[in-house]
Amino acid sequence: GKDESEWTCVFHGSTLSKKERTIMLTGDSGSGKSSLSTILMGNNFSLIADDFSPMSISGNHYNFPSAISIKQGFYKPASKLFNDFVNLKQYFISETKGNVKYLPPDNKNEMVLNTHCDKVFSVKFGKNLSNEIKEVNKGIALNKILPDAWISNNMEHVKNFINWVKETTFYDLTYNDNEKIVKMINKII
């Protein structure tokens, strides 16, 4: 294990990998981030971390295995991607969140313990939104992800974080069609 001095930051995001290419999905609660993670897992991506994505001083994102919480509105698409989804126990969270099921990381895909992530997507799902991925200015992207991130105040970690930002491409991603957005992501990675 690593001790606190080895962690540069923790993001509020989901990190996934496919064929040694790694992406992170960020977005507000209810933005479709967990749904897109589930869709990508059903399309040969390995889940590295969901909702809590730690990055070490070496710039690698580490496996933080936890189940993805799937809201009731996404049960039908999730059950098409994962045969045993219907058998998962349902939990009532609150009046606002409603019922959820917890989908564990898919063991048919390769388990990735740590990897370098150089593409970050700010996700937004909406039935009236177009399927679009566009590169965005790093400053604008950081304004979205930093409020929910923890960054070490150690100067070496801060420098490593800045270097990671310089090497990383940030995107805004909107979608309404699962198959189309998977194809678009696969082209970018």
Language-model segment annotations:
Residues 36-37:
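Post-Walker A alpha-helix
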Residues 14-27, 42-189:
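Glycine-rich, often acidic-flanked micro-motifs
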Residues 31-32:
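Conserved glycine(s) of the Walker
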Residues 1-20:
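Extreme N-terminal, non-catalytic leader segments
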